Every structure is written in structure tokens, then in C-alpha cells.
From Swiss-Prot:
It is found in: Plastid, Chloroplast. This is Divinyl chlorophyllide a 8-vinyl-reductase, chloroplastic. Highly expressed in leaves, stems and flower buds. Detected in roots. The gene is DVR. Changing P333L: Decreased catalytic activity, accumulation of divinyl chlorophylls and pale green mutant. GO terms for biological process: chlorophyll biosynthetic process. It comes from Arabidopsis thaliana (Mouse-ear cress).
Length: 417
């Protein structure tokens, strides 16, 4: 699930800005289908970055113990991409698949960690997974079990230079968020560092700036521990935290129904929130940039797609324009969601199992009202101008493609698998 999408809430540790807006059991089978390119792809595009200062945090456990003799050079950035081992977790998720492809395109030696049954509801078997990740070394393992993951990496017989985490909880539920967005992601850090990794690229989300949801708390906790590791404990270790805005596919859910003549649904006047949506290809390219570009070392990197920020109203207008029809909107009062959430919260006090349903309601409410843009700490407002742009793919082109071809292959959810 892409949790920082625009659907168009718990106290949390939130790092205080310092300088803002600078220029299974072990599955022993290991299958290899690798054909990395020899060429280097390296860009020097600048982007807005954030750095934080924090109180000293409790160190991540196990990072300093049991360092393997299988180690890589700390100067991996001086190597040719074909000699750099990049471990990608969450490799079969929506963004993870594109990250693997982009890394292979740039010539890195990619190790893609996947489960034997991957995809939404585990619909993909090993053969399909190998096909999807062609060109990568596919390692079948389980990121939710640290000992299993470590054994898997040990069996590779070589070290790791960089870990790229594209893990995300399936649906943003309370238990799932802490299991995946925090624990499994931490496992990938611990295991990667044990086998020599010197850099960690984390796919996070721009919405963690205003943490009202459980998955945001889980992501922020890991972010803080990752930063503390690099900045306070181990100066030879670095990170890049990527916080994207909305993904194209998260905004495409209404294309088919509008195409069939139904109205475009939005909350309020359609101007409650805005985003600078980014395509999966462009985001994957930005994540790949973070492996070697030194201006992205130890940075929190919010990133959006090209062009202006778009409200739900404007997104709907673009869709009707492509279809050549007069806009037809259904405006839903956001107070309806507040009422439903209030009822679910009250029931959850008596029946805790309802808490998950209440959380899902809060997620929908959040995306209906909060912009996926940089939150300016000085004004307390979301800023289109301060949200950096990257890439070339536009939402209009995406909508046109979906109208022609449908949303096949664009299923959201279960980024973990």
C-alpha cells in the first residue's frame, strides 16, 4: 500500500528541524538471474533536503554485535556500479519493483529479497517473482525474522554495500505498521550492517511531517534511530531518507468510474489538500540517485513530481479534459468521516478489535484533508514552492494511459511482499 497517497491519528516523536530547505524459517534456495549492465548512471540534480537534530536516542539493538567477516569496503562510492552490492528489501512492492529495475539499468549488482509467495495476497509464486525481478539476484527470505534474514544473506557468500528499503505496511493498520514499517525495516538495517553495508536508503513518506497515524509513528521511530546511528554512533555509516509525495496510481482510482459517466468524488470543495504526484519510474530514479550522490548523504529528502501542486478538484478537471467532457463532481462533506471515526473510536474503547477499523477511517480522513507537500515549520502551512520537483512524468499523461489501457498492474497494497 502506498501510504502517502492523496485519498482525495497518536502523539509521536518528531525530530525538530535544524536547518530547513537547504539548496519463515530460512528458505535455503537462492536463485540467481543476474545480468547487470556495466554503464554508470550518475546525476547531480539538487533537491531540497532536511537535516534534524534530536535528543540522544536509544541505539538500535544488535548493530554493533557479531559483525561478519564478510565485509565490504567502506569506500564503495569509489567502485564501479557493477562491483557495488545493493540489497533491496520490499523488492516486489509497487515502488520496489521499479527500484530493482532502475538499479539494474544503472549497472549495480542487485540482491532482491522476496518471499516465496509475493504480491497482493501472495498471488505470485517463485517463478513469477523471478520473472518480475529478472536481472537481479533473487533471495527468498523473510524480513520479519531477523535470524532468517541474516542466514539468507550469509548464504550469499558475499557482502553488502548498500541497503535500499522499500518496505511498507499493507494497509496502515496498527499491528501491521509496527511489524513492517518499524520492525522489518529495522531487521534489514541490522542484517545489512552486519554484512558490511555502509549506506541505507529508506523509502519513507512526506506525510510523517504531521504524525497523526500509527504508521507515521512507526516510520518516524525508525527514521530517528537510523539518523542517530549514522550521526551519533558510527560516522562511517550513512543514510538517505526519501519522503515522496503522492504516487500516480494512488490518484487513479476514479479514472474508470468517471470514464463510465459517473461523477468525480471529492471531499469538501475539492481544495482541502494538494500534492505534487510522482511516477513510480521517477521515484525509483531518485532513490537510485541516493546510492552514489554525495549531496544526498545523511539527508532527509522530500520529493515530488514535476509541475504545480494539484488539488483533487484540479485532478478531476484534468481527467474530464482528457475525456472531452463537462466536469461533473460529487462533493462529500468531510464531517461525515469525522462522525464515523468518532463512533468507531467510542466502540473501540469497549471492543479493542474495532481499533483497526477506526485507524483505517483516520487514514482516509487524513488524506482527504492534509496536503502531501512540505510543511513549513515557520508558517505551519504546506508549501508548494518549497516542495522540490523531480522527473518528467505528468499526472495528465498517466490519466491518459489509464483511460487507454486501464489500471491493470497498478494494484496498490502489500508493498511488504
Amino acid at each position: 500500500m502506498s501510504l502517502c497517497s492523496s485519498f482525495n491519528v497518536f502523539a509521536s516523536y518528531s525530530p525538530k528541524p535544524k536547518t530547513i530547505f537547504k539548496d519463515s524459517k530460512f528458505i535455503s534456495q537462492f536463485q540467481v538471474k543476474s545480468s547487470p549492465l556495466a554503464s554508470t548512471f550518475h546525476t547531480n540534480e539538487s533537491s531540497t533536503s532536511l537535516k534534524y537534530k534530536r535528543a540522544r536516542l536509544k541505539p538500535i539493538s544488535s548493530l554493533d554485535s557479531g559483525i561478519s567477516e564478510i565485509a565490504t569496503s567502506p569506500s564503495f562510492r569509489n567502485k564501479s556500479p557493477k562491483d557495488i552490492n545493493v540489497l533491496v528489501v520490499g523488492s516486489t512492492g509497487y515502488i520496489g519493483r521499479f527500484v530493482v529495475k532502475e538499479m539494474i539499468k544503472r549497472g549495480f549488482n542487485v540482491i532482491a529479497v522476496a518471499r516465496e509467495k509475493s504480491g497482493i495476497r501472495g498471488k505470485n509464486d517463485k517463478e513469477e517473482t523471478l520473472k518480475q525481478l529478472q536481472g537481479a539476484n533473487v533471495c527468498f527470505s523473510d524480513v520479519t525474522e531477523l535470524d532468517v534474514l541474516e542466514k539468507s544473506i550469509e548464504n550469499l557468500g558475499f557482502g553488502v554495500d548498500v541497503v535500499v528499503s522499500c518496505l511498507a505496511s499493507r494497509n496502515g493498520g496498527i499491528k501491521d505498521s509496527w511489524k513492517i514499517d518499524y520492525e522489518a525495516t529495522k531487521n534489514s538495517l541490522v542484517a545489512g550492517k552486519k554484512f558490511g553495508a555502509k549506506h541505507f536508503v529508506l523509502l519513507s513518506a512526506i506525510c510523517v511531517q504531521k504524525p497523526l497515524l500509527e504508521f507515521q509513528r512507526a516510520k518516524l521511530k525508525f527514521e530517528a534511530e537510523l539518523m542517530d546511528l549514522a550521526e551519533q554512533q558510527d560516522s562511517s555509516f550513512t543514510y538517505s531518507i526519501v519522503r515522496p509525495t503522492a504516487f500516480f496510481k494512488s490518484l487513479g482510482g476514479q479514472v474508470e468510474i468517471v470514464k463510465d459517466g459517473k461523477p468525480y468524488v471529492m471531499f469538501g470543495d475539492g481544495k482541502l489538500c494538494a500534492c505534487k504526484p510522482i511516477s513510480e519510474q521517477d521515484l525509483a530514479a531518485f532513490i537510485a540517485d541516493c546510492v552514489l550522490e554525495e549531496n544526498k548523504i545523511n539527508q532527509v529528502l522530500p520529493i515530488g513530481g514535476p509541475g504545480k501542486a494539484l488539488t483533487p478538484l484540479e485532478q478531476g478537471e484534468i481527467l474530464f479534459k482528457i475525456l472531452g467532457r463537462e466536469p461533473k463532481f460529487l462533493k462529500v462533506p468531510i464531517e461525515i468521516m469525522d462522525f464515523v471515526i468518532g463512533v468507531l473510536d467510542s466502540i473501540a474503547k469497549i471492543f479493542p478489535s474495532v481499533g483497526e477499523a477506526a485507524e483505517f477511517g483516520k487514514i482516509g480522513r487524513y488524506y482527504a484533508a492534509e496536503s502531501m507537500l512540505i510543511l513549513d515549520p515557520e508558517t505551519g502551512e504546506y508549501s508548494e514552492e518549497k516542495t522540490p520537483s523531480y522527473g518528467k512524468d505528468t499526472l495528465e499523461d498517466f490519466f491518459a494511459k489509464v483511460i487507454r489501457e486501464g489500471m491493470a498492474g497498478q494494484e496498490l497494497g502489500e508493498q511488504f511482499f
